[in-house]
């Protein structure tokens, strides 16, 4: 039977790369998408579930049968400063609760460098780092097997990745740096094979 891993935020810049990297190692990604999201051509053949993540029943159905979930959702910059609260805290919490209900026991969460920091310029966007930390805490307390990835300075660069060095540290060890989104995606796939 094929391995299936759900990816929420699969149409985003990091999310679609996570799905592509899953395909590269023979895992079938189940793309969890907003109704209006576009999917890159490389993922058109993948299973797609369009839903509002606030709909608990739809979320449970979307996750049922998956062996794991990679959460790559994130609030987009907007004049609506409640986005980070709705997406990065409550939306993450809702996905975790759904995993508990349908027995998806492994979760990888893409968060952000400096999550939880109050005095940081990114917090001008709806206290995003504070809300991301609340989402992380929900996962930490869930009883599920989990990994939180906190990348910073995400770049779109796709060349020279084989010459990159990824520095893995514990929480709050790095203040700044940059990493290509493709390498974050690979870290997510690697994390699926590593129990917390």
Label every PLM stretch briefly.
Residues 191-196:
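Core catalytic loop region at the nicotinamide-binding pocket of NAD(P)H-dependent oxidoreductases
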Residues 16, 89, 186:
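Residues forming the Rossmann-fold NAD(P)(H) cofactor-binding site
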Residues 152, 170-179:
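Short, glycine/charged-rich beta-strand-loop motifs at protein surfaces that mediate ligand recognition
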Residues 92, 175-190:
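Substrate-positioning beta->alpha
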Residues 5, 31, 37-101, 116:
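NAD(P)H-binding glycine-rich loop region in Rossmannoid oxidoreductase-like domains
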Residues 75-169:
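Glycine-/Pro-rich loop/turn segments that contact NAD(P) or position catalytic residues
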């Amino acid at each position: 039977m094929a391995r299936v891993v759900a990816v929420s935020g699969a149409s985003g810049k990091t999310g679609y790369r996570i799905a592509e990297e899953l395909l590269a190692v023979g895992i079938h990604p189940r793309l969890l998408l907003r109704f209006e999201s576009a999917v890159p051509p490389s993922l058109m053949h993948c299973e797609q579930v369009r839903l509002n993540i606030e709909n608990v029943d739809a979320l449970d159905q979307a996750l049922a049968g998956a062996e794991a979930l990679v959460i790559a959702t994130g609030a987009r910059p907007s004049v609506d400063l409640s986005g980070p609260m709705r997406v990065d805290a409550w939306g993450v919490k809702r996905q975790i609760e759904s995993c508990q209900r349908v027995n998806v026991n492994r979760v990888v969460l893409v968060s952000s460098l400096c999550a939880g920091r109050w005095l940081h310029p990114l917090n001008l966007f709806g206290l995003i780092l504070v809300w991301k930390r609340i989402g992380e805490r929900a996962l930490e307390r869930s009883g599920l097997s989990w990994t939180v990835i906190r990348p910073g300075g995400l770049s779109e660069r796709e060349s020279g990745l084989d010459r990159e060095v990824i520095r893995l540290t514990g929480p709050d060890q790095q203040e700044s740096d940059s990493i290509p989104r493709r390498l974050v995606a690979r870290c997510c796939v690697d994390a699926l094979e590593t129990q917390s």
